[in-house]
Regions:
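Hydrophobic targeting/anchoring helices
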Residues: 117-122
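Ferredoxin-type iron-sulfur electron-transfer modules and their immediate structural context
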Residues: 1-102, 106-110, 114, 125-136
Length: 136
């Protein structure tokens, strides 16, 4: 988490710290998935996906573009990009779309904006997720 640019603004990290989860107790069973940096404004790091489906629903219901979907079942379930090539660059998603801004864990990141909020000023740096007024 400390090296992730979503650190301090990640809901999963905030909940894990609240529950005092500090080390992994089980072997990770997820395969190493590629990073998609094909889009001019966005990067997808599929390895961070927790399968919450927020981007899938936002893309379908709010943006009406159906850019994302989940594929597979059980442990093979994973996020995919709905394009012929499977690359984000071959979709009509923009950085302003709801789907590009809804990810709670940093799967979808904006290029040229990394680490824009300094340490100490991030969402969960001063108040825990439990203390936040606007948590969902």
């Amino acid at each position: 988490c400390p090296s992730c640019e979503k650190s301090g603004d990640c809901k999963l990290q905030a909940v894990a710290y609240q529950l005092e989860v500090k080390t992994l107790h089980f072997t990770q069973l997820f395969p190493d998935r590629p990073v998609d940096a094909s889009h001019p404004d966005l990067v997808l790091d599929f390895n961070r996906c927790i399968l919450c489906e927020l981007c899938v629903r936002a893309s379908s219901e709010v943006d009406r573009k159906n850019v994302f979907a989940l594929s597979g079942r059980g442990i093979t379930k994973h996020l995919i990009v709905n394009s012929e090539s499977g690359q984000l660059a071959d979709t009509d998603i923009t950085a302003a779309d709801k789907a590009a801004n809804v990810c709670p864990v940093g799967v979808i990141l904006h290029k040229r904006r990394g680490f824009a909020v300094p340490i100490g000023k991030r969402r969960y740096d001063e108040k825990s997720i439990r203390e936040q007024e606007d948590h969902e």
